């Protein structure tokens, strides 16, 4: 009995000693499988923090400039939006007004806001009030220039080539044309062909628009004066200049000189220097025709007036003289206006210069 009891106790001890070993084996096996699962899943992915945008939106109230009544409200306008973007949204709300005929003012009677101006630059708060004015039917500036310059070219060509249809046939065949008539035709064509080519390939024409009434006024001015000049110069009874060929040759050379200078100045204005502190100020280069920049702020107008003065002396006709006087007055006003802008921006460069005529104007 004692031996049997002892053997039972021995079996119990062996049984209790065997249980932890099997449990440890199972735990090790489970840990191994878990580690294999983690390794096969790959590295843990880091979650990126979501940034909430704090973009400020403006609400623009558009009122009629005359009646002060509300037309519409343009909302959800961002800080980087421009006046052009506001016009686009205004056009969607009111389709009868397309963007080119929309004029927006910050205050009644103030200047119209340019398309490139940002909304943030004119905003005093999140709510902005703008005044709307209908600018009427608009035309692109390239169309305006092409219409104004192509008309004189074709009109003068008609008077020169079809004189028998305009004047008396007997007088046209009786009186031979003076050489200055042919030279005037050549110079006139050179002038307007240059303007047309520069409009298409040289000038950086603004993307803005001009009212239709300005196109009509410009065409009436250029076309009307060209018809008057061409009628007198190509008339069978046209009287040549008083000093003969000497007057014609000198004025023709000066005309071509001014035309060349005008072209080179326009080329410089279209491709300004972008180095130095005067990045936007037009400056002369190695070309002698551009050295007029040392004396005046707007040498292109100076050369233009010089061309028409030379044409007046060459043809010695009243219509050309009147046209030259009117062009001189108009270009002087343009030059003085541009000269004031240059003085505000680049006073150290233009304070000793004249606007259009050296030492005079």
Curated annotation (Swiss-Prot):
Class of this enzyme: oxidoreductase
Membrane topology type: Multi-pass membrane protein
Protein's GO biological process: lipid metabolic process
Compartment(s): Membrane; Endoplasmic reticulum
EC identifiers of the protein: 1.3.1.-
Ribosomal protein recorded as keyword: no
Keywords annotated in UniProt: Endoplasmic reticulum, Membrane, Oxidoreductase, Phosphoprotein, Transmembrane, Transmembrane helix
Protein name (database record): Trans-2,3-enoyl-CoA reductase-like
Species annotation: Mus musculus
Lineage: Eukaryota, Metazoa, Chordata, Craniata, Vertebrata
């Amino acid at each position: 009995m004692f031996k049997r009891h002892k053997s039972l106790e021995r079996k119990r001890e062996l049984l209790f000693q065997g249980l932890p070993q099997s449990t440890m084996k199972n735990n090790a096996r489970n840990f191994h499988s878990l580690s294999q699962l983690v390794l096969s899943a790959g590295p843990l992915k880091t979650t990126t923090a979501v940034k909430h945008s704090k973009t400020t939106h403006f609400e623009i109230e558009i009122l009629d400039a005359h009646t002060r009544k509300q037309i519409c409200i343009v909302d959800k306008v961002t800080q980087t939006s421009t006046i052009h973007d506001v016009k686009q949204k205004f056009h969607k709300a009111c389709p009868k007004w397309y963007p080119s005929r929309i004029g927006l003012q910050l205050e009644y009677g103030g200047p119209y806001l340019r398309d490139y101006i940002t909304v943030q630059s004119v905003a005093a708060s999140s709510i902005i009030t703008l005044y709307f004015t209908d600018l009427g039917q608009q035309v692109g500036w390239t169309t305006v220039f092409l219409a104004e310059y192509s008309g004189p070219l074709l009109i003068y060509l008609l008077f020169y080539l079809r004189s028998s249809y305009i004047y008396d046939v007997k007088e046209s065949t009786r009186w031979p044309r003076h050489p200055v008539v042919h030279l005037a035709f050549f110079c006139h064509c050179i002038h307007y062909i240059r303007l047309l080519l520069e409009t298409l390939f040289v000038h950086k024409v603004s993307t803005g628009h001009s009212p239709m009434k300005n196109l009509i006024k410009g065409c009436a001015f250029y076309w009307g004066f060209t018809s008057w000049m061409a009628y007198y110069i190509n008339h069978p009874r046209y009287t040549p200049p008083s000093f003969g060929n000497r007057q014609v040759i000198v004025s023709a050379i000066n005309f071509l000189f001014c035309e060349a200078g005008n072209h080179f100045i326009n080329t410089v204005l279209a491709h300004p220097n972008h180095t130095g502190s005067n990045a936007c100020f037009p400056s002369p280069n190695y070309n002698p025709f551009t050295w007029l920049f040392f004396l005046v702020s707007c040498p292109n107008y100076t050369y233009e007036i010089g061309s028409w003065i030379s044409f007046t002396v060459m043809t010695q006709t009243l219509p050309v003289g009147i046209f030259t006087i009117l062009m001189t007055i108009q270009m002087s006003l343009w030059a003085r206006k541009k000269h004031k802008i240059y003085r505000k921006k680049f006073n150290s460069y233009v304070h000793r210069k004249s606007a259009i005529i050296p030492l005079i104007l």
